[in-house]
């Protein structure tokens, strides 16, 4: 299923949340309705962690992660790091990265097996991403945009990318990532799909302005429809069991 939500009248859900198969980060300071949408769907399966990064609420922009790990910028405080480590499942590694392009959520997009990264990230950053997230790493652009995390969102089951992505690149990326991909939008025609959407292998959250057509594409490409509901439940249960 896919659900709509808002963070203090902002529809850029991906700016204020980071969702994986093992945990969900949500920004401090949101409304109860915002938190309730996430906790109602996730709290029985994975921890929903209220967090800030360097005192900033845009946790989705600043972090990248999957079921294996969480990457945060170097200016994350010691207190914030400790809170994250305490709240995350024991199997999830949490690592600071000293990187000039510190909005990691904008420069990295990943699932549990592979990551696409901004072409200009440091080579040391690339190694840390590979080691912490346990993924194959590829430098790439999407529709000639270097901010791959802003213009794409992927899971182990599918991905949504910038609406102007050419068919040839869609095919290339789909082969590379080994998942089906679609070019599309969220929030009524917004190309910033990574900013307007968070999704894991069984549930998605979009901004309130996301249309029914956009929501349907999200549910289909990420295989979240009713026809895959039992499969999604099995996936969720398997992931949760592996984390316990």
Residue ranges and their predicted role:
Residues 1-244:
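The feature marks the mature, well-folded catalytic cores of soluble enzymes
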């Amino acid at each position: 299923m896919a659900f709509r939500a808002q963070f203090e009248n902002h529809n850029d859900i991906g700016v204020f949340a980071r969702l994986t198969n093992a945990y969900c980060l949500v920004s401090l300071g949101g409304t109860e309705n915002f938190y309730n949408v996430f906790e109602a769907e996730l709290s029985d399966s994975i921890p929903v962690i209220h967090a800030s990064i360097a005192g900033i609420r845009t946790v989705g922009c600043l972090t990248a992660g999957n079921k294996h790990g969480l990457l945060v910028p170097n200016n994350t405080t010691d207190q914030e790091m400790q809170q994250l480590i305490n709240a995350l499942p024991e199997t999830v590694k949490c690592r600071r990265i000293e990187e000039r392009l510190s909005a990691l959520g904008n420069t990295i997009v990943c699932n549990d097996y592979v990551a696409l990264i901004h072409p200009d990230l440091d080579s040391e950053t690339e190694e840390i991403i590979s080691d912490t997230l346990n993924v194959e790493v590829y430098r790439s652009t999407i529709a000639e945009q270097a901010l791959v995390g802003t213009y794409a969102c992927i899971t182990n089951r599918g991905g949504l990318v910038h609406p102007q992505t050419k068919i040839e690149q869609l095919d290339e990326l789909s082969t590379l990532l080994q998942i089906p991909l679609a070019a599309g939008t969220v929030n009524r025609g917004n190309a910033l799909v990574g900013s307007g959407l968070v999704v894991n292998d069984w549930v998605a959250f979009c901004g309130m302005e996301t249309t029914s057509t956009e929501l349907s594409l999200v549910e289909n490409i990420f295989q979240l429809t009713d026809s895959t509901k039992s499969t999604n439940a099995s996936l969720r249960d398997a992931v949760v069991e592996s984390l316990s």
